[in-house]
């Protein structure tokens, strides 16, 4: 039998779009689609038992920084605890895990970045592969999608800060790097791509305005960095050690880790806090797991408010 791809999607409309994409590409017969959530252990066990996949690409996450700052318990639940559930299920049939992470996990200033850093540790603790990327252009909800909508509506383009810079990759580049990371003989481990430079978001906005509205004078409005935002990101921290890239342009990163038993105990503390809806305890547990996480004033205020309400 030929290779098959198993797709799990939590959104019915997104799953429908995926199915139609496979039909249009004439490859629908090589795919099996599931509507469900990566936190559903019984569904995951059913999928792994039935299909026994060799490789799992885990990309499900809450990824919008402002929403994660506003909904911290939901973000921890989906980005950390659901990842733990997924990895536990995958380990029952020795599936190789490749996890898509973000440069926001490095010395995180956002709750999203901190949750992705813990998810990285979960995957690495189970012998998986982590690929830490920058911003993927034209992905769902990306800055390109937002700017394109604003241009189409004749609105000014909104950029958070004149100095805001990011690493950018195309979807094709990101997919190629995921496959390369899965096949890299140096794995399991943490990989980052060899990216040449950070780009100003304002330059991207100007390029899109020239390209999509060449006959219009499109204004750019600068607001300010949002809660959890940084002016620029980095691909590894000062406590991590990069190795020279190999032929596939991936850099292997040595990342500090703690004893597995200690890590599992800290995860259990985090899970208990989330399940009891105790934001202050969840934030404290998250900061133990990610010591270089600097919570925003918005998250700290929300935590303090929750403590007063519970008190």
What does each of the following model-derived ranges do?
Residues 1-52:
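N-terminal Rossmann/SDR dinucleotide-binding element
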Residues 34-35, 77, 222:
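Conserved residues in the N-terminal Rossmann fold of short-chain dehydrogenase/reductase
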Residues 22, 50, 72-74, 113-118, ...:
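Short secondary-structure boundary/capping segments
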Residues 33, 99, 130-132:
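Conserved beta-strand scaffold in the Rossmann-like NAD(H)/NADP(H)-binding core
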Residues 120-311:
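Strand-loop microenvironment adjacent to phosphate/nucleotide-handling motifs in alpha/beta enzyme folds
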Residues 52, 58, 62-117, 125:
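Conserved Rossmann-fold NAD(P)-dependent oxidoreductase catalytic core, especially the SDR/UDP-sugar
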Residues 10, 39, 70, 78, ...:
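Residue-level signal for the nucleotide or nucleotide-sugar donor/cofactor binding architecture
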């Amino acid at each position: 039998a030929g290779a098959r791809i198993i797709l799990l999607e939590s959104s019915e409309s997104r799953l429908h779009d995926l199915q139609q994409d496979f039909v249009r590409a004439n490859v629908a017969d090589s795919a099996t689609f599931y509507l469900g959530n990566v936190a559903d252990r019984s569904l995951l066990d059913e999928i792994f038992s039935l299909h026994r996949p060799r490789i799992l690409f885990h990309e499900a996450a809450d990824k919008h920084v402002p929403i994660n700052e506003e909904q911290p318990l939901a973000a921890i639940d989906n980005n950390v605890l659901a990842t733990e559930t997924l990895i536990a299920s995958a380990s029952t049939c020795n599936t190789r895990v490749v996890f898509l992470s973000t440069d926001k996990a490095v010395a995180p200033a956002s709750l999203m970045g901190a949750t992705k850093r813990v998810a990285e540790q979960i995957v690495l603790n189970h012998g998986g592969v982590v690929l830490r990327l920058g911003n993927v252009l034209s992905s769902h909800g990306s800055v390109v999608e937002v700017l394109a909508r604003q241009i189409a509506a004749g609105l000014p383009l909104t950029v958070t800060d004149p100095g805001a810079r990011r690493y950018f990759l195309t979807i094709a580049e990101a997919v190629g790097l995921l496959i390369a990371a899965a096949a890299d003989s140096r794995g399991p481990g943490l990989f980052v791509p060899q990216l040449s430079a950070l780009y100003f978001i304002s330059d991207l906005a100007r390029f899109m305005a020239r390209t999509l509205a060449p006959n219009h004078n499109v204004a750019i409005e600068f607001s300010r960095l949002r809660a959890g935002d940084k002016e620029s990101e980095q691909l590894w921290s000062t406590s991590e050690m990069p190795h020279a890239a190999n032929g596939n342009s991936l850099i292997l990163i040595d990342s500090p880790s703690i004893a597995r038993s200690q890590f599992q105990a800290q995860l259990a503390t985090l899970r208990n806090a989330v399940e009891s809806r105790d934001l202050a305890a969840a934030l404290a547990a998250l900061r133990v797991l990610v010591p270089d996480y600097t919570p925003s004033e918005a998250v700290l205020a929300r935590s303090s408010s929750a403590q007063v309400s519970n008190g």
